[in-house]
Amino acid sequence: MLKYNLMERANPITNKTMFHANLVPATPFPLEMIVANVCENCNIKPIQLLNALYYLEKEIIKALQDGYSVRLGDIGSFHLRLSSVSVPSKEDFSAESLRSLKVRFIPNTRMKKELSLTNSKVVLVREDECNEERGKGNEV
């Protein structure tokens, strides 16, 4: 179940206040649980899977540092994005104009489909409604 809340924001152009939905920060699902779940379905020991994931991470980092995008089959792909300061002309641009590199993950088609609002397995609940339901069972 995914929880969301409504945030009030003022539109800087029209100065009208509007409400927008935001996902409530999710509780992290630890790697150890993912490894345990995968190992239940495969003939592999948890330490072997953790070792493979460790080296997978190293290879992804190395490939990104070498300028490649990295595709992980039906999971998706990673690539780097560069952030810089805007300058009026090419001549004004220097290495100091560069701000940061950001790692981007783009899910593959199947993952996008599985995590879309049209999928019946994706359940969204407004946080305040979820809390009201939880409180009803505790009333005396």
List the predicted regions and their residue ranges.
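Strongly charged
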Residues: 1-51, 55-140
